[in-house]
């Protein structure tokens, strides 16, 4: 395969102008009028705690330690342990269904 053997470029065909009408076109969505309604939402205590700043279910120190271990090539993965956990989780899912 040679880079020099490429097919010649073909010019793009001209764009045909379309006919426009002088009458204004109304958008059906804009023309509709809707009454505004409000919805009230009440959060559970658990949800309210999750929404508070500073409450995190992620251990950021552990995440940084894992990032550092990966970066340094020091992270050891126990594939057998991971496989066992996946199988156990799949079995639990099958039993609950």
UniProtKB/Swiss-Prot annotation:
Signal peptide: none
Region (Disordered): 1-39
One protein family per Pfam: FlgM
GO molecular-function term, one example from the UniProt record: sigma factor antagonist activity
Keyword hit for ATP-binding: no
Function, in words: Responsible for the coupling of flagellin expression to flagellar assembly by preventing expression of the flagellin genes when a component of the middle class of proteins is defective. It negatively regulates flagellar genes by inhibiting the activity of FliA by directly binding to FliA.
Protein name: Negative regulator of flagellin synthesis
Organism in which the protein naturally occurs: Escherichia coli (strain K12)
């Amino acid at each position: 395969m040679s880079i020099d053997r490429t097919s010649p470029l073909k010019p793009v065909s001209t764009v045909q102008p379309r006919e426009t009408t002088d009458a204004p076109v109304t958008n059906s969505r804009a023309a509709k009028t809707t009454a505004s309604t409000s919805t009230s939402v009440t959060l559970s205590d658990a949800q309210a705690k999750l929404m508070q700043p500073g409450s995190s279910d992620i251990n950021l120190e552990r995440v940084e330690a894992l990032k550092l271990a990966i970066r340094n090539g020091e992270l050891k993965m126990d594939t057998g342990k991971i496989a066992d956990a996946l199988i156990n989780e799949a079995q639990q899912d099958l039993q609950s269904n």
